[in-house]
UniProtKB/Swiss-Prot annotation:
This is Glutaminase. Belongs to the glutaminase family. The gene is glsA. Disulfide bonds: none annotated. The lineage of its organism: Bacteria, Bacillati, Actinomycetota, Actinomycetes, Kitasatosporales. Substrate binds at S67, N117, E161, N168, Y192, Y243, V261. Keywords: Hydrolase. Transmembrane segments: none annotated. Homotetramer.
């Protein structure tokens, strides 16, 4: 098993291997503001439990966090309402595309898990009910955990998502018809699009995810979640965090992870460290091609895995 002092050469080796591989995958094109990203960009960061960060490539370049933010809104809402959340969203893999309407009808408006779009909308809705500003609460948390007060929303991305957000609107209206949404749908969608438009770097996001490696403890030493609830989030990340490719990701990488269509993936080694990798080129399931390859190499080279 690797020790933290060997992270830097491991990252450099991974970056060299990724650089030798021709850029593959395509940036998300259904959100026009993301489509222009160069699929050959690559960054990777590892954050130790004490906040020390190692990185390679474009690890300080901000990118659109997108679905990575779902991990943090889930944690913030669980910290407030606890297990009552699970009456409104499940914890099972969906096996369907992340923006699918099909299962919602079969399951009476209860999304399969908090990481598909329908589930994330429910979590954001409930957090907004409890805080009055879910997107603002998320941003404050990310700034505090990353130590970066300059983190913010990419307004171009938020506007682009709003202009092409009919599927998310349909999901929200459908769940509202079952009584599983509290806030007016336009209010919820504005919060959700702002949430997903957060721009952050690999360093920022690796640091922000640290509470999951510290079993619920924030960067300042205060407890956000019980050890049990931190375990729950890690478990749902492992089984549901990479859209309908979660089984393949677990097979290859062996860590709890969450991907986003901005090309980012965050991953957790409980008790050791957290990672964030970014490569805008996506595979057919919406996961970063370079990101999955880099995390695969990381766990192989270091022996750090939950298995």
């Amino acid at each position: 098993m690797s020790t933290p002092t060997t992270f830097r050469p491991v990252l450099e080796r991974i970056a060299e291997e990724i650089e030798r591989t021709p850029g593959s995958g395509r940036p998300a094109d259904y959100i026009p503001a993301l489509a222009a990203r160069d699929p050959r960009r690559f960054g990777m960061a590892v954050a130790e439990l004490d906040g020390t960060v190692y990185g390679v490539g474009d690890w300080r370049e901000p990118f659109s966090a997108q679905s990575l933010t779902k991990v943090f809104t889930l944690a913030l809402d669980l910290a407030r309402e606890g297990d009552a959340l699970w009456e409104h969203v499940g914890r099972e893999p969906s096996g369907n595309p992340f923006n699918s309407l099909v299962q919602l009808e079969y399951e009476n408006g209860i999304p399969r898990n908090p990481f598909i779009n329908a589930g994330a909308l429910v979590v954001t809705d409930r957090l907004h009910t409890r805080t009055g500003d879910a997107a603002g609460e998320l941003l404050a948390f990310l700034r505090a955990e990353s130590g970066n007060p300059d983190l913010g929303h990419d307004e171009e991305v938020a506007a682009s998502e709003a202009a092409h957000g009919d599927r998310n609107a349909a999901l929200a209206h459908f769940m509202a018809s079952y009584g599983n949404i509290d806030n007016p749908v336009p209010v919820l969608l504005d919060q959700y699009f702002r949430q997903c438009s957060v721009a952050a770097s690999c360093a920022d996001l690796a640091l922000a995810t640290g509470f999951l490696a510290r079993h619920g403890i924030r960067a300042d030493g205060t407890r956000l979640l019980s050890r049990s609830r931190a375990k729950q989030i890690n478990a749902v990340m492992l089984t549901c965090g990479t859209y309908d490719a979660a089984g393949d990701f677990a097979h290859r990488v062996g860590l709890p992870g969450k991907s986003g269509v901005g090309g980012g993936i965050i991953a957790v080694v409980p008790g050791h460290c957290t990672l964030c990798v970014w490569g805008p080129g996506l595979d057919e399931r919406g996961n970063s091609v370079a990101g999955v390859a880099a995390l695969d190499r990381f766990t192989t080279l270091t022996g750090l895995s939950v298995f």
